[in-house]
Amino acid sequence: MIDIHSHIVFDVDDGPKTLEESLSLIEESYRQGVRIIVSTSHRRKGMFETPEDIIFKNFSIVKHEAEKRFEHLQILYGGELYYTSDMLEKLKLKQIPTLNNTKFALIEFSMQTSWKDIHTALSNVLMLGITPVVAHIERYNALENQKERVKEIINMGCYTQINSSHILKQKLFNDKHKRFKKRARYFLEENLVHFVASDMHNLDVRPPFLAEAYKIICRDFGKERANQLFIENAQSILKNHYI
């Protein structure tokens, strides 16, 4: 499997704090069958502002150690880019990374971002010649039960990603992700999803659930669809090809 959304670099955002935590997280992902992980540390003005050179330095350490430790594993560079006008300028100047240096970039919004602002933001990124991969679409209130809006995003030329944790079965009680899980299922049933990724941050609260999610998609939507969502579509964009 291929994971295009992960927080595996230590001491740069709200992901791992140490190199050992990074490697433990990667080990769990590897155990689940992932062989390519794109590191997408947060870039968010006012919240995650680690200098680019530090992120890349720590990424390089993680990549070297992980690829040495785990056979046939590839760690690639990217970022989860929170949309602001400042981010757009940095993307234009190539000061922040796309996914594996391709024309595809992982773009994030706040849960409360309006539909108008999401639409405008994605249009602005597309005008740079960069295709947005919209991170965890199930988190945005403006898209809840709004298949026409998501179709419009896709028809503009964007791709969509949902988190593997939100594919899992709802807990009977106190499932704080219940709303996200319902939305993710809705988008899957409407065939509006291009990628499932882990968005893993740590082993305690936000671990990877790719193996479990893959089984559920196979069972409910078929193996062919599962392979597209977990492997084939990601292979395409990481080679800089459209899906």
UniProtKB/Swiss-Prot annotation:
Protein name: Tyrosine-protein phosphatase CpsB
Pfam entry (one): CpsB_CapC
Keywords: Capsule biogenesis/degradation, Exopolysaccharide synthesis, Hydrolase, Manganese, Protein phosphatase
EC numbers: 3.1.3.48
Molecular function (Gene Ontology), one example: protein tyrosine phosphatase activity
Cofactor(s) the protein requires to work: Mn(2+)
Role summary: Dephosphorylates CpsD. Involved in the regulation of capsular polysaccharide biosynthesis.
Family: Belongs to the metallo-dependent hydrolases superfamily. CpsB/CapC family.
Keyword Hydrolase recorded: yes
Gene Ontology terms describing biological process: capsule polysaccharide biosynthetic process
Catalytic activity field: O-phospho-L-tyrosyl-[protein] + H2O = L-tyrosyl-[protein] + phosphate
Pathways per UniProt: Capsule biogenesis; capsule polysaccharide biosynthesis
Keyword Manganese: yes
